Structures are given as C-alpha cells and as structure tokens.
Amino acid sequence: MRKIWELKKKEAQKEKNASGISPAQIRIQKDVTDLEIPSTMSTSWPDPIKLNVLHLEIRPDEGYYKGGKFKFRIQIDDNYPHDPPKVKCLNKIYHPNIDIEGNVCLNILRQDWNPVLNLNSILVGLQFLFLSPNAEDPLNKEAAADLHKDPQGFASRVRTAMKGGLVNGISFDNVMA
C-alpha cells in the first residue's frame, strides 16, 4: 500500500512539473467552481491567486447558534484530495464539536475522509454542526456533557458565550451578527 502511495506522489509531482499546476490545484479549482453556497454562508480567499486557503463564515438561521457569525479557515495542502483540508474555527466558541483552540471534530475531516468528497461536503458538514451539535463525538467534553444532561441550560450558556460572556470561567468571543 505504501508503494502505491509513493507512486501516486511521484506521478503527481511529474504532472506538476509538466504543466506548472499540481493535481491538487486542479481539483481545488474544480471544487471552487462547483461550490453551492447557501444564504447562511459566505466564502472569501485572502489571496485570490492561491485557492488553497479559504475563509468561510457561517450564519446559522436556526438552532442553538442562531444569530451568530462563525468564521473558519480552510487550508488545503498539496495532497488534496487524498488528504482532507485542515479546518480551524477562528472564533472562541462554546460548542461540543469545536474546542476553545478552534479545532473541529467532524468525521469527514478525519477517518471518514475519502477523495470523492469535496469542499461542498465540508461546508455542509460544518453547517450541520451548528444545526445539530453532536454530543456523542466531542472535542469539548464539558459542552457535550452539558448538552446531553441539560439541553435548556446548554442553550442558555451558548447564548451567553455567543455574546462574549463567561461560561465555566472561560471568556468567549462575541459572535452575534
């Protein structure tokens, strides 16, 4: 299996050298062209020449996080689509699947990733985290336990955190739109 991976890397490097554009860049261009951005999201590129870094803003219109603006950075490396993009939440938020450092727990960004998935898949997955947080597979175990044991209290603490308040002694970013 390792030999196959090494051969694929060599082939990709040959293709890049021949055309000046890597297979990852070609795939990223296709994914960007195929993006279907709902009204609750917006995208931007810090450098329009380099499509491998994407900024995403999610504005949920329902659920616990309704009314917030959540910013993400999506970084795509040269092994894409064989490796998933790296996604980081740029806001400090109270969420079972996003820790206070901004790391995101989404299965398609880890063990469930495969090369047929694309940027649209990631956007849909991130949006779903805000509509239906998953307490069964958390990064923020306190928030997950809170959601599981006391959904109404969790909702109240999410609102407090979204307004830039303190939850369990931790200060969160004001993300209210």
From Swiss-Prot:
Transmembrane segments: none
Any one GO CC term of the record: nucleus
Domain UBC core: 23-167
SMART domains the record matches: UBCc (SM00212)
Gene3D superfamilies hit by this protein: Ubiquitin Conjugating Enzyme (3.10.110.10)
Catalytic residue list: C105 (glycyl thioester intermediate)
Official protein name in the record: NEDD8-conjugating enzyme ubc12
